[in-house]
Amino acid sequence: QMCIRDSNFECLLHEKPFAGVNGSGKHDNWSLVTNTGKNLLSPGKTPYDNKQFLLFLSAVIAAVDDNAALLRMSASNPGNDHRLGANEAPPAIISIFLGEQLEDIVEQILQNGTATHSNKGERMDIGVHTIPPIKKDATDRNRTSPFAFTGNKFEFRMVASSMSIAGANTVLNATVADVLQSM
């Protein structure tokens, strides 16, 4: 009340989008870490040979694939449903983006039963001779995938700004645990 009286501000308890204003959402950075601090989704220097990482990566992929509707529901409300697919938001369908390096490893495993190498990140030469080529990030930087691997975690980009991430995390934790139990 003091803020309104003193500054002539008003408070809207509604998330965007509004006409002419992009939507609001949040990015839920999700990973699996042991009680000793080991990140189970850390690819390491040789992700193609990191069996523990590949096991947990495949469990997450299977969980999201098998339970896409549940995951979608965990991020759903009327304002957010209006935002998704427009207003600088990811599409309203669940898909996973792994990045070029991990996609190549998964393709090798699917075709050959094993992976023997991984593509190294490319280097960008920006054309300035005093600046050396910069290592290009091999993960998703364009923000168009609702569920993207970003280095050592997944980023779930569908959750509404007005929602807690607890629902989405509960779905992720339970469905990944279910897949791991069945392996």
What residue spans do the PLM features occupy?
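Glycine-/small-residue-rich beta-strand-loop submotif within the FAD-binding core of flavoenzymes
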Residues: 35-40
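Short, small-residue-biased leader/transition segments that mark boundaries at the very start
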Residues: 2-4
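C-terminal accessory/tail domains of diverse enzymes
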Residues: 7, 41-183
